[in-house]
């Protein structure tokens, strides 16, 4: 496949152009603002289009080199969408609470992931002789760790790139990535600082339809990267008898080649 296509019409229908109330703006967003309507800033989609296309190319190239992409979106309307996009594209995600040190203190996070795996093994065993209370306590611990770390349990190390919905809410995640030199792609609304990310995408970061569109495009770009990587290794995805090395690739490829879905309804 190739990089995913999108149109100005899709962006408009998803409400990508709607910013926040004018009094909430960040002056650094001035170059990306078209104007205002009813005290709401209107984002200049003529700038969003090339910047979004650039972000898709960077994602495809990074994943095509074997890089790992981390989706980050913990706000209510982004949580499920982010997780689904990451799973479809065989990538990784944080969609609950960002734990301080998730990137900068990876050793501690790795220990927690190992604990999560041990709990899974313990709870799947019938021979531990646990009481109901002991099992319940272990299940609660496992569920808590799964919510926080389930999306990165197989990542192996820090990611090679991060895609963020709402840089204000995910400020700690962005700071940690910058400290480690991890490139950040992010949707920047009219109240955000575009200078804190490497690849800004001016747009609405609150509407579920807009979030669904961004995540779908980023996921498809990652799938394109995986397929190009396998192609460069001489793997014929269409005729290979062996299963793809990425566990989610089969589902991802099928969905990516289907006709584009309409983004979800706005929150």
From Swiss-Prot:
GO terms for biological process: translation. GO terms for cellular component: cytosolic small ribosomal subunit. It holds the Pfam family Ribosomal_S2. GO terms for molecular function: structural constituent of ribosome. Residues 238-261 have a biased composition (Low complexity). InterPro entries: Ribosomal_uS2 (IPR001865), Ribosomal_uS2_bac/mit/plastid (IPR005706), Ribosomal_uS2_CS (IPR018130), Ribosomal_uS2_flav_dom_sf (IPR023591). Keywords: Ribonucleoprotein, Ribosomal protein. CDD domains: RPS2. Belongs to the universal ribosomal protein uS2 family. Residues 237-267 are annotated as: Disordered. This is Small ribosomal subunit protein uS2.
């Amino acid at each position: 496949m190739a990089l995913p296509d999108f149109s100005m019409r899709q962006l408009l229908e998803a409400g990508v152009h709607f910013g926040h109330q004018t009094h909430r703006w960040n002056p650094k967003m001035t170059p990306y603002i078209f104007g205002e309507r009813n005290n709401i800033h209107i984002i200049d989609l003529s700038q969003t289009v090339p910047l979004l296309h650039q972000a898709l190319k960077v994602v495809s190239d990074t994943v095509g080199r074997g890089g790992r992409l981390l989706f980050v979106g913990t706000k209510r309307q982004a949580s499920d969408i982010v997780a689904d996009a990451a799973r479809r594209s065989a990538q990784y995600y944080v969609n609950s609470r960002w734990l301080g040190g998730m990137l900068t203190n990876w050793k501690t996070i790795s220990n927690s992931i190992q604990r999560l795996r041990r709990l899974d093994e313990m709870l799947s065993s019938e021979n531990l002789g646990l009481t109901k209370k002991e099992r319940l306590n272990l299940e609660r611990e496992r569920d808590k760790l799964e919510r926080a770390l389930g999306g990165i349990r197989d990542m192996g190390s820090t990611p090679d790139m991060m895609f963020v919905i709402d840089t204000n809410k995910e400020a700690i995640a962005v700071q940690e990535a910058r400290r480690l030199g991890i490139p950040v792609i992010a949707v920047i609304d009219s109240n955000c600082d575009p200078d804190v990310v490497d690849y800004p995408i001016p747009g609405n970061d609150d509407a579920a339809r807009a979030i669904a569109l961004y995540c779908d495009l980023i996921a498809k770009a990652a799938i394109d990267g995986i397929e190009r990587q396998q192609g460069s290794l001489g793997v014929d995805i269409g005729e290979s008898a062996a299963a793809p090395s990425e566990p989610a690739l089969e589902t991802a490829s099928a969905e990516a080649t289907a006709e584009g879905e309409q983004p979800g309804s706005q929150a």
